């Protein structure tokens, strides 16, 4: 379900010359050229196991065009999912969150590594 985990598994499968069908949560093609779904994944409960964004090699002035009062912002995600069950929404109904110290650690890493001092929380449900 988490794209960060799936993309790493796809890269590992590619580098090992393995079939993409071994990676759950992906649409791919079978040997006959027909689309197949490799199966559902269980949502990751512990968001601290998801790799943090690596901005190395990214021109942050070009990437982060969102400037507020002259400051470049980077996205921070503290939670995923939602506690509500709105019928019109595609957000997963499993609410998961990161511990405060994990979020603070990521912010401090971004400040130290990239000199970024402004962040935008991109959570779907900030007050969950």
Set out the residue ranges of the language-model regions:
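Radical SAM [4Fe-4S] cluster-binding motif and immediate context
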Residues: 53-128
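Electropositive phosphate-/nucleotide-binding environments in soluble metabolic enzymes
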Residues: 4, 44, 76, 80
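Glycine-rich beta-alpha loop elements in corrinoid/cobalamin-binding modules
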Residues: 1-43
